[in-house]
Amino acid sequence: MQPQYQMGYDRAITVFSPDGRLYQVEYAREAVKRGTTAVGIKAHDGVVLIVDKRVSSKLLESSSIEKIFKIDEHIGVASSGLVGDARALVDRARIECQINRVSYDERIEVEALAKKLCDHMQTLTQYGGIRPYGTALLIAGVSDGESRLFETDPSGTLLEYKATGIGIGRPAAMKVFEEEYTADLALKDAILLGLKALHSATEGKFDVDTVEMGIVESSTAQFKKMTKEEVASYVGQFKQ
């Protein structure tokens, strides 16, 4: 049963409760909190995204689970929450990148893309007949030689981080980052720190088949998803 004071205020996205809350947005955030853990770490020479794919059955092909997406040559995202909603946002992000190239003949800035996505997500908290996206994104990229890492949430809030996590394991991952992150990390060390955070978030329940990684190096400004062999190499180093 819902509390009496809450009934009626969570029926429509456009209605605030007396204490200033939008319950549908809060419920969308809960969908993110139930999602798999994704972490992002900014190093002095790039950015890394690492995701726990949570293979729920031995019959499931782990390669069919995709939580990290290449958006443009220099930008990638990791998602947590409803996978279908994440795909819709990824498609929109790719279109925004193409529009920018056609209009200005140049790559879109990482921050500009993040703001466009958050503006779109925010509009879905204002109108009836629709619902907020039940997903959050970590947006990693390089602009003008500088590494950037942004986090979105269903309300359209945009925050930039040095290191962060989303999903069910966020508290454990953030504890690791707050204790061990330093701004002078090299990309390889950032990957190992990200694996440590993911290890803590999943209570050690990960291996090469359940981990997905993507990196963008400042020197090349090229985002790439790591191969299974590259992931296995870093997981092996971490477990030594």
From Swiss-Prot:
Keywords: Cytoplasm, Proteasome
Activity regulation behaviour: The formation of the proteasomal ATPase PAN-20S proteasome complex, via the docking of the C-termini of PAN into the intersubunit pockets in the alpha-rings, triggers opening of the gate for substrate entry. Interconversion between the open-gate and close-gate conformations leads to a dynamic regulation of the 20S proteasome proteolysis activity.
Family annotation (CDD domains): proteasome_alpha_archeal (cd03756)
Gene Ontology BP term (one): ubiquitin-dependent protein catabolic process
Major subcellular site: cytoplasm
A single GO molecular function term of this UniProt record: threonine-type endopeptidase activity
Pfam families: Proteasome, Proteasome_A_N
InterPro entries in the cross-refs: Ntn_hydrolases_N, Proteasome_alpha, Proteasome_alpha-type, Proteasome_asu_arc, Proteasome_asu_N, Proteasome_sua/b
Subunit structure as annotated in this protein's UniProt entry: The 20S proteasome core is composed of 14 alpha and 14 beta subunits that assemble into four stacked heptameric rings, resulting in a barrel-shaped structure. The two inner rings, each composed of seven catalytic beta subunits, are sandwiched by two outer rings, each composed of seven alpha subunits. The catalytic chamber with the active sites is on the inside of the barrel. Has a gated structure, the ends of the cylinder being occluded by the N-termini of the alpha-subunits. Is capped at one or both ends by the proteasome regulatory ATPase, PAN.
Record-given protein name: Proteasome subunit alpha
Native organism: Methanoregula boonei (strain DSM 21154 / JCM 14090 / 6A8)
Gene for this chain: psmA
